[in-house]
Amino acid sequence: MSQLVECVPNFSEGKNQEVIDAISGAITQTPGCVLLDVDAGPSTNRTVYTFVGPPECVVEGALNAARVASRLIDMSRHQGEHPRMGALDVCPFIPVRGVSVDECVLCAQAFGQRLAEELDVPVYLYGEAARMDSRRTLPAIRAGEYEALPKKLQQADWAPDFGPSSFVPSWGATATGARKFLIAFNINLLGTKEQAHRIALNLREQGRGKDQPGRLKKVQGIGWYLDEKNLAQVSTNLLDFEVTALHTVYEETCREAQELSLPVVGSQLVGLVPLKALLDAAAFYCEKENLFILEEEQRIRLVVSRLGLDSLCPFSPKERIIEYLVPERGPERGLGSKSLRAFVGEVGARSAAPGGGSVAAAAAAMGAALGSMVGLMTYGRRQFQSLDTTMRRLIPPFREASAKLTTLVDADAEAFTAYLEAMRLPKNTPEEKDRRTAALQEGLRRAVSVPLTLAETVASLWPALQELARCGNLACRSDLQVAAKALEMGVFGAYFNVLINLRDITDEAFKDQIHHRVSSLLQEAKTQAALVLDCLETRQE
């Protein structure tokens, strides 16, 4: 799964459409960047852009946009209702998929340093990227706004993190940083504004003040009345949905409303939402209601129903979930997303990757998928009704393993490519030689870890496959037989890929440990596959 970072730069121009479009163009023309939204405000004279992409791409996209802004925006003439201090006022980086906040901090640091060096402007780090507590919040950095910068920059306490401590009239200053994804989530009530606000005060982290904190961490909240819909809302901002989830806010609001004898009539998501936030809610309701729902589309539909996300307007996942708006990979990348014909063609081409490691991962992924298939061919049928509970338990591990193993098809090829890149590093000086040696050793360890992960993943499936062989739909006997051999073959391939990469690793203790482990996994695969085949051969109709 590719990494995805959201970038939300705020530029101090909301009236001149040519400038707004030029900045949009700079972002969309950056390879790897997908522009999701452009929100221009004439009264604030400010435009908020939302775009996503891999970490290195969004940094380039933000820089390209800033270059255009430096030519077209003159802060000495800027007027607007929104607080501001620079042509590019603020530029946060936000993790969406496969990226940590710490990695987004690195994005902010790289962007801030390059922006300051190229445009010779002052840049401050805020949020999770802040280097001192006094700069964690944007209002603290922006205090006094653009007009205060000439004197502020002369103070030692306000020396920028990057760039000169001098006033640049046409630009001002920029703040960049990292934060978690913010979700705006409103719950609908048939009640009054005051009742909604009472609930918000009980729930939001701030509560009613220091002496009366609320129950939900990382949640802001207020109550208001939506005249056009003739209902009240508990309006919340989830500052970290992994600390307090969507379903937690909804369920707690329902509990508060019940105590006030108020009906909750659905909810509303404002803006875009990460897929994980909805899948976490789906997992909660599946467990709470003992539901067996495997497909992502159906799990999203469940959440839309349980939270009433379509109560005020249609909720289209394809238009509201960030990951659905962004292609997983470019057309030239992603073995796992290619057709079978294209994948086989690449394997057969005159290149070292994809090779045996990717083929082993693909075989194991298909073996796990066959296990899932047999489980589903058993589940929900009247003649196997007594096995429904068992199948509910057995099917998910196969589906999860199949998805994980599919990612290893690409991971193996990428590990090999990274090793080749290390091979090409210069080795003219002692320092370069040391750097190259370290990179080669790291590349070899990565090349070992991928097939080892494959073998470990398959090992976790043998108990489930044994049980499926004993009680699964016998009409699928041959499918389970193929599954057993495909999984064994995957481990077989992993074993030899580990060995060939261990050969040049210099850490002997590491080599011995990994060799012993992968040998054990191969022997286990041979034994377990044979047991599955024997069980299937002896089973009677």
UniProtKB/Swiss-Prot annotation:
Q: Where is this region: Linker?
A: 327-334
Phosphoprotein found in the keyword field = yes
Q: Which GO terms of type biological process are on file?
A: cytoskeleton organization; folic acid-containing compound metabolic process; L-histidine catabolic process to glutamate and formamide; L-histidine catabolic process to glutamate and formate
Sequence intervals crossing the membrane: none
Q: Where is this region: Formiminotransferase C-subdomain?
A: 182-326
- Per the annotation, which location comes first and is thus the protein's main one? cytoplasm
Q: What InterPro entries has UniProt attached to this entry?
A: Cyclodeamin/CycHdrlase, Formiminotransferase_C, Formiminotransferase_C_sf, Formiminotransferase_cat, Formiminotransferase_N, Formiminotransferase_N_sf, FormiminoTrfase_cat_dom_sf, Formintransfe-cycloase-like_sf
The record's keywords, sorted A to Z, are: Cytoplasm, Cytoskeleton, Disease variant, Folate-binding, Golgi apparatus, Histidine metabolism, Lyase, Multifunctional enzyme, Phosphoprotein, Transferase
PTM-bearing positions, type Phosphoserine: 316, 386, 520
* Name under which the protein is recorded: Formimidoyltransferase-cyclodeaminase
Keyword flag Lyase? yes
Cited function: Folate-dependent enzyme, that displays both transferase and deaminase activity. Serves to channel one-carbon units from formiminoglutamate to the folate pool.
What is catalysed by this protein? 5-formimidoyltetrahydrofolate + L-glutamate = N-formimidoyl-L-glutamate + (6S)-5,6,7,8-tetrahydrofolate; 5-formimidoyltetrahydrofolate + 2 H(+) = (6R)-5,10-methenyltetrahydrofolate + NH4(+)
Signal peptide limits? none
The record, for Gene3D superfamilies, names: Formiminotetrahydrofolate cyclodeaminase monomer, up-and-down helical bundle, Formiminotransferase, C-terminal subdomain, Formiminotransferase, N-terminal subdomain
